[in-house]
Amino acid sequence: MTSAMTVQELAARLGARLAGDGERPVCRAATLLGAGGDAVSFCTSKRHLPELRRSGAAAVLVRAEHEGDCPGTALVVEDPYLAFIEVVELLHPEPSAPPGIHPGAVVASDVVLGDGVSVGANAVIEAGVELGAGSTVAPGAFIGPGARLGTGSWLGPNAVLAGGCRTGERVRIHAGAVIGADGFGYAPLPDGQGWRKVPQIGGVDIGDDVEIGANATVDRGALEDTVIEAGVKLDDHVHIAHNCRVGARTVIAGGTLVAGSTTIGRDCLIGGLVAITDHIRIADGVSLMGMTGVTGSIRESGAYASPLPAQPVRQWRRNTVRFTQLEGLFRRVQALETGHGMVGDAGEERDD
């Protein structure tokens, strides 16, 4: 679904300075080279100036220093990328589900429904649930007993908000995500006879303005809640284990795994496929490069990394063999230092 307006109207909505033809109608957002005469695009840096100069867009969002490079109409703003987000929202408004309960939904008799709630086909909402005003439960979604979906929130198709879990306002939980599955807790039985499941009686507490990607999982706490603070963004396939706390405004990219009882600070940026061990603390303002393995607490803000970059396979094989020889090399250097009365790093084994 698209919406149309003139470039001049768009400039007024954005608070942009118009340089060029403001009467042209626009109805879509596009890339610089994919834009035609009905589209708006954006340019954020000099790296994209060649594409800007070739663009056929009706208007382009640019900074003041790039206005002269725009072949057509320029919309001059301080931050073209943020302004472009607003353009997308204006020209491509997200369709909203109609208020009401679909006849195919199963809704317990004591569910508290706020004004304008929408419940889709085959959704199941169990006893004691509260749905905030303007919230949406998409087709096939499940909400367990006593859970709460906050005002203006959206639970996507086939997503689960398990019993006793709560969200704040304006939360988006995408398709297939599971909030409140049991945490991974087992106690070993005597004599190696197996494992006994530890009951998980905590919940999940999600703050305002959180977004959780498709097929992500946030496990309920063992005794107390797993907590996702306000403004957190979790990508698809992220896993947050039981008893964790993720600090406000932290962003975690796809495939990252956070083990139990770990606390991640506020305003952290965590790349994809990061593995974070259990029972540690990560300070506010930490950035972790994709594929980093975190095995201990990080107490100072800053950027951290530990991935192995790709290399030609023959080189990788040689380096792998050399890595297995490190212990022997260490012992040889240690013996040489000892024989010559030298004291060096090779003479000390350290675990840190």
UniProtKB/Swiss-Prot annotation:
<comment type="subunit">
    <text>Homotrimer.</text>
</comment>
<feature type="active site" description="Proton acceptor">
    <location>
        <position position="242"/>
    </location>
</feature>
<keyword id="KW-0443">Lipid metabolism</keyword>
<dbReference type="Pfam" id="PF14602">
    <property type="entry name" value="Hexapep_2"/>
</dbReference>
<comment type="similarity">
    <text>Belongs to the transferase hexapeptide repeat family. LpxD subfamily.</text>
</comment>
<dbReference type="Pfam" id="PF04613">
    <property type="entry name" value="LpxD"/>
</dbReference>
<keyword id="KW-0012">Acyltransferase</keyword>
<dbReference type="GO" id="GO:0016410">
    <property type="term" value="F:N-acyltransferase activity"/>
</dbReference>
<dbReference type="GO" id="GO:0009245">
    <property type="term" value="P:lipid A biosynthetic process"/>
</dbReference>
<keyword id="KW-0441">Lipid A biosynthesis</keyword>
<dbReference type="InterPro" id="IPR001451">
    <property type="entry name" value="Hexapep"/>
</dbReference>
<dbReference type="InterPro" id="IPR011004">
    <property type="entry name" value="Trimer_LpxA-like_sf"/>
</dbReference>
<keyword id="KW-0808">Transferase</keyword>
<dbReference type="GO" id="GO:0016020">
    <property type="term" value="C:membrane"/>
</dbReference>
<dbReference type="InterPro" id="IPR020573">
    <property type="entry name" value="UDP_GlcNAc_AcTrfase_non-rep"/>
</dbReference>
<comment type="pathway">
    <text>Bacterial outer membrane biogenesis; LPS lipid A biosynthesis.</text>
</comment>
<dbReference type="Pfam" id="PF00132">
    <property type="entry name" value="Hexapep"/>
</dbReference>
<keyword id="KW-0444">Lipid biosynthesis</keyword>
<dbReference type="InterPro" id="IPR007691">
    <property type="entry name" value="LpxD"/>
</dbReference>
<protein>
    <recommendedName>
        <fullName>UDP-3-O-acylglucosamine N-acyltransferase</fullName>
        <ecNumber>2.3.1.191</ecNumber>
    </recommendedName>
</protein>
<keyword id="KW-0677">Repeat</keyword>
<comment type="function">
    <text>Catalyzes the N-acylation of UDP-3-O-acylglucosamine using 3-hydroxyacyl-ACP as the acyl donor. Is involved in the biosynthesis of lipid A, a phosphorylated glycolipid that anchors the lipopolysaccharide to the outer membrane of the cell.</text>
</comment>
